[in-house]
Amino acid sequence: MRKVYVIPTYHCNLKCPHCELHLKEDNFSEKFFKILDDIKSPDITLFGGEPTLYRERLKRCLETEKISSISTNLLILDAELISLYKYYGISIATSWNPKRFTEEQYKLWVENLRKLEENGLKCIILITLTEDLLSYENFNLLLKEWDNIESIEGILFEPLLDYQMSRDLHERADLWICSLYDEWNFRIRNLIADKVMKWDCNCSDVWTLNPNGQLSRGCPQFEKKFVLNECLGCNLAGICRPCHLQHICSFPKNLYKKVLENANLASSSISARA
């Protein structure tokens, strides 16, 4: 198993508009831990829902010493959790989107990012490319604020998965990311600029362990699989292994061209100096 998402609960303390996982029935079973004990994978992520909601489930997962990372909204963070993350060497990912937090929740989230910093822990921020993000004013001001929080190592922008979305959303998101890429002048890494050079969304060996103990093939969002006709003859097939859950091409082609051009320019500059 190349990658496994382990979901101790679907319950969540947020109701993000682009996420429907919290609507699923939890139906937790002790079978969950029996299956987790048998799983062998180099990359196991605690996912949800919000995996920190039920402390004993979380601790039992970590005690297997198989968990490598956690995806958390970071609204729950205390001395015990910090100690657990440090002891088990857990990589942390958290998320932000314009409609994710109330004002008070956002303040708490930033406080907890600073707690990570104070305790020598690092994280990345995941941001879904939603309509409201593309129209969000003064996003650069947020980036400047986050750039001063040493716990934040990088930001990864991710394509929205929504079968009701506008058909040109991914194209507009690509152009939005390109504009941001041109202006990027921060300590924080823009991780999609790295990912776009090897866009591997292949989920053939990705699995999800659900709270009821069912182990299913695919990521937590898996519903149905699409094979797009445009992918079959695409000249970027060697670079892009697409997400088969997307019903519209989500590969940021314009960003890929920009990053490739910059890499070629940098290579030419090094060769000229040699």
Please give the residue ranges for each predicted region:
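Cysteine-centered iron-sulfur cluster-binding motifs in ferredoxin-type domains/subunits
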Residues: P8-K15, E50, S204, C234-C240
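Residue-level recognition of short loop/turn positions
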Residues: K15, G48, N210-N212
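Residue-level signal for mature regions of secreted extracellular proteins and peptides
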Residues: Y5, T9-C12, D194, K224-V227, ...
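A C-terminal junction/extension of Radical SAM enzymes
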Residues: S151-G154, E158-F222
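Canonical Radical SAM [4Fe-4S] cluster-binding loop centered on the CxxxCxxC motif
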Residues: M1-K31, P242-C249
